[in-house]
Amino acid sequence: MKDIHNFTENDLDIMYIIENNPKLTQRVIANRLGISLGKVNFCIQSLVDVGFIKLKNFSNSENKLGYVYILTPKGAVAKLRIANKFLLKKQAEYEKLYNYIHESES
């Protein structure tokens, strides 16, 4: 099972997209994020395995079965924790770059 520190920004992006657009296909998600369909499939399967996302079948307008991706309550909590982790990481990177720039100006 993945630890909260092992999730990637792609996992986080996918959780946000699924929360707002549960009927999107993996292909559409991949196009929106600019990553491969295989990567999206891998991330979604990982999120399903840890219980952050559930899959439900639905019948779409073309008489085919599709999936609805549902962010679980556990997934909603994890999404906030992962987002906070990335925010802290980005803040640290910003401060490091800021210090490099100001040190080189001195």
Residue ranges and their predicted role:
Residues K2-D11, T25, K56-L80:
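Short, cationic-aromatic polyanion-contact patches
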Residues R27, G38:
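Key DNA-contact positions within bacterial/archaeal DNA-binding proteins
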